[in-house]
Amino acid sequence: MPAFFEGEFWQIANPELWVGVGLILFIAIVIWAKAPAMIAGKLDETAAKIQTDLDEAARIRAEAEALLATIRAEREETERQAIAMLAAAKADVAQMEIEAKAKLEDQIKRRAEMAERKIAQSEAQAQADVKAAAVDLAAQIAEQVLMARLAAGGSDGLVDTAIGQIGAKLQ
């Protein structure tokens, strides 16, 4: 490669000269066309768009975190309510169980009393039936005994009337 200040470099046939001239012309055209300003503007636009996207992403993230915090708070509140509802339900079940036991005991007591009353009535009725049967039997036996005595010793009209009334009076 020939040195820049040597005469050989400045000859028209030297391709390195034309490469240098082309490079200088290219740089001049780029500067004249305001390419650096356009490139800087495009870079600034891209940077601004990226910054806007980052700001939007930060805003969305903040909203998502706030929403997540709200959802967590709602979930915790719901869990507290569920625990309270479960405790209330358990208390209600316990109260219902106590009431059901009391009602069952009361019903059993009433049925036992009713059964005892029926048994007492049946016993009283049976005793009354037995008494009535005994009275009837005693009256019949007395009537037969008196009839036999009267038949053996004669009959008196007053005694016959009294014997007829014995059965009705004993009952």
Curated annotation (Swiss-Prot):
Give this protein's Gene Ontology molecular function annotations. Answer: proton-transporting ATP synthase activity, rotational mechanism
TM ranges: 19-39
Q: How does it sit in the membrane?
A: Single-pass membrane protein
Name its cellular compartments: Cell inner membrane
Give a Gene Ontology cellular component term annotated to this protein: proton-transporting ATP synthase complex
Q: Which UniProt keywords apply?
A: ATP synthesis, Cell inner membrane, Cell membrane, CF(0), Hydrogen ion transport, Ion transport, Membrane, Transmembrane, Transmembrane helix, Transport
Family membership noted in the UniProt record: Belongs to the ATPase B chain family.
Report the function annotation for this chain.
F(1)F(0) ATP synthase produces ATP from ADP in the presence of a proton or sodium gradient. F-type ATPases consist of two structural domains, F(1) containing the extramembraneous catalytic core and F(0) containing the membrane proton channel, linked together by a central stalk and a peripheral stalk. During catalysis, ATP synthesis in the catalytic domain of F(1) is coupled via a rotary mechanism of the central stalk subunits to proton translocation.
Q: Tell me how this protein assembles.
A: F-type ATPases have 2 components, F(1) - the catalytic core - and F(0) - the membrane proton channel. F(1) has five subunits: alpha(3), beta(3), gamma(1), delta(1), epsilon(1). F(0) has three main subunits: a(1), b(2) and c(10-14). The alpha and beta chains form an alternating ring which encloses part of the gamma chain. F(1) is attached to F(0) by a central stalk formed by the gamma and epsilon chains, while a peripheral stalk is formed by the delta and b chains.
Q: What is this protein called?
A: ATP synthase subunit b
Q: Which organism is it from?
A: Caulobacter sp. (strain K31)
